[in-house]
Amino acid sequence: MSFLDYFLGSRKKSANVAKDRLKLILAHERDADGPDFLPALQEELLAVIAKYIPVDKENIKVSMERRGDFEVLELNVLFPDQH
């Protein structure tokens, strides 16, 4: 390995590391914003569920996350006890 190859080779490695870090930062910022439609979706789901079961708005949580190549929409509903 020559003197120039040593320095040129390290630049490629550091460039790849910087590129990977930038991808992580951009992905994190993209996820932090969240989809704009989630509040409206939560309201509509509450209206549909309320037709059949009385449930409070605070008991419905809608979230979206990325898992690999997929985006997963998660819906958690806490139903009231039926005594």
From Swiss-Prot:
One matching Pfam family, short form? MinE
Say what the protein does. Prevents the cell division inhibition by proteins MinC and MinD at internal division sites while permitting inhibition at polar sites. This ensures cell division at the proper site by restricting the formation of a division septum at the midpoint of the long axis of the cell.
Biological process terms from the Gene Ontology for this record are: cell division; regulation of division septum assembly
Coiled coil where?
Answer: none
Task: Extract the signal peptide range.
Answer: none
Q: Which Gene3D superfamilies match?
A: Cell division topological specificity factor MinE (3.30.1070.10)
Under what name is this protein listed? Cell division topological specificity factor
Gene for this protein?
Answer: minE
